[in-house]
Amino acid sequence: RGNYPVFKRNLRQWMMRITAYGKRLEDDLDTIDWPDKVRAMQRNWIGRSEGATVRFDVSGAPGAGSSPSVLEVYTTRPDTLFGATFMVVAPEHPILGGTAGGDADDEAALTLPQAWPEGTKNAWTGGAATPRQAVAAYRAQASAKSEAERVDEERTKTGVFTGLFGINPVNGQPVPVFVADYVLWGYGTGAIMAVPAHDDRDWAFA
């Protein structure tokens, strides 16, 4: 109310790791006397899928730092690895470093390059002078959006380049890493490999 800005803040809490029980929960649905429609709804909610976790080494981060040097992505189509043209991480992903989204000192705490890599396209920078400025500004914007707004399929996909590159493990090619709010930190690994030829959201972002 009153058009005051709303920001998300990270809080310590415990959560049940439902994914660890996904197979058991789904298998046990066959042992209970529920209507087929309800069991189908439960299976959709559990959302178990078959796939592979792929690790991309990350280059471009400034030497020492607490940020991880590997990005993990989950894919149901490992055969599309050769078609990955970029990667996208959630604004809250620890590879970026930083503080809670929207904090004034977020830019200084980001573990990103201090200058744009040579050949960076202007359209990737969000009009910022450095990757840290671009990502800090984008994280502040993303923190003011609800999860429903972020995953709205009708919304124009936005994002900025982080200055980092993931190394494709199958061919050794570097692929740029972007930050975008349509990727959620609480879903999967909080990072995706983007294959525009096989995914509508990746195509829209590209």
Where are these regions (language model features)?
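NTP-handling and nucleic-acid-processing catalytic cores
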Residues: 1-205
